[in-house]
Amino acid sequence: DLQAAYQGDPAATSASEILLCYPGMTAVIYYRVAHALYELGARLPARLISDIAHSTTGIDIHPAATIGGYFFIDHGTGVVIGETAVIGERVRLYQAVTLGAKRFQEGEKGILVKGAPRHPIVEDDVVIYAGATILGRITIGKGSIIGGNVWLTHSVPAGSNVLQAQMRNTTVEPKHLIDAVYQPRI
């Protein structure tokens, strides 16, 4: 994670600077500790640690989320990563990115099902730019780029570029939405 931050930010001058001054790095360190505790069954301490990280950095990562290595959050403020999100290796997020739920699964008598998969899967080598909102149990394919301020509720295949301008003034039937909003990279 530290190496990803250093190599991913041209303004970074040293590992010490990143460890001491980058809220994204602070949030990821807290997440790694909280996630380990969560996996060991110490869920309340894990949630407390993630709450401290959120209060300190403005970045909200649920300790149950699964995040691969070499992960970098640049600028960070307002990033939200939900409980069942899965993030691959070498993923980079910018400020105000949300990996959230679109709807909640209900069981008997309308009671919400705890822990049901409802957050995105982000595959390896993906970059998600500032203000993007990605909702639901969808997949962002390997090597994709999600542009700033994109609102995305459908999966996109590997190598896609999804840009906010493609979303503007677009009226399509839901089954044709993916064709209207993504453009595979060549």
Kindly label every feature range from the protein language model.
Residues 1-51, 175-186:
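Terminal amphipathic alpha-helical/low-complexity segments used for targeting or macromolecular assembly
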Residues 54-170, 174:
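Structural signal for interior beta-strand "rungs" in well-ordered beta-sheet cores
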